[in-house]
Amino acid sequence: MEHYISLFVKSVFIENMALSFFLGMCTFLAVSKKVSTAFGLGVAVTVVLGISVPVNQLVYSLILKDGALIDGVDLSFLNFITFIGVIAALVQILEMILDKYFPALYNALGIFLPLITVNCAIFGGVSFMVQRDYNFAESIVYGIGAGTGWMLAIVALAGITEKMKYADVPAGLRGLGITFITVGLMALGFMSFSGVQL
């Protein structure tokens, strides 16, 4: 149990997808204007990561891994296309659920919801799972932890951005300039966790 808690904390803080690996920055920067929208997208990314990482782990270990189906047959060259297909299917299912049960969030996310399909944070989580050779239970914990870390980062950035509306930001830094500085400072803060041994 301690191993799974350690893996979760590590994936949220020490190896944060957005602030350590800078994955998923397109939606991270674009949807971080309001906390409510950022939280909704963060939950969507967490759900997709929490489902796609373990599902892709099963696909990889049972079908694509060297010798999984037949001894001597290595289908790992199909990793990228298979993982992207699984992620795309899961995002389509999530999009239909949000459209039916949460139409306000669906409309607020707009074009960024289908873009979760090509969000490199999702694919990065799946790739890290393969690279680190996580088992099924570890991939569940890692997927949820990585999504939670990404959500924590985007909600924190949205909160700071909302507060910055009342600040006197110099004209040359307004918009993306101050956002990049803020993200850099947040990344420095999260970097302080890198010395923690779990």
Swiss-Prot record:
A family per Pfam: Rnf-Nqr
GO CC list: Gram-negative-bacterium-type cell wall; plasma membrane
Chief location category: membrane
Keywords: Cell inner membrane, Cell membrane, Ion transport, Membrane, NAD, Sodium, Sodium transport, Translocase, Transmembrane, Transmembrane helix, Transport, Ubiquinone
Keyword Transmembrane helix: yes
Catalytic activity annotation: a ubiquinone + n Na(+)(in) + NADH + H(+) = a ubiquinol + n Na(+)(out) + NAD(+)
EC number, UniProt record: 7.2.1.1
Molecular function, one GO term: oxidoreductase activity, acting on NAD(P)H, quinone or similar compound as acceptor
Protein topology in the membrane: Multi-pass membrane protein
TM spans (from-to): 11-31, 35-55, 77-97, 110-130, 140-160, 176-196
Cellular localization per UniProt: Cell inner membrane
GO biological process: respiratory electron transport chain; sodium ion transport
Cited function: NQR complex catalyzes the reduction of ubiquinone-1 to ubiquinol by two successive reactions, coupled with the transport of Na(+) ions from the cytoplasm to the periplasm. NqrA to NqrE are probably involved in the second step, the conversion of ubisemiquinone to ubiquinol.
Family (UniProt): Belongs to the NqrDE/RnfAE family.
Record's subunit section: Composed of six subunits; NqrA, NqrB, NqrC, NqrD, NqrE and NqrF.
Name recorded for this polypeptide: Na(+)-translocating NADH-quinone reductase subunit E
Lineage: Bacteria, Pseudomonadati, Pseudomonadota, Gammaproteobacteria, Pasteurellales
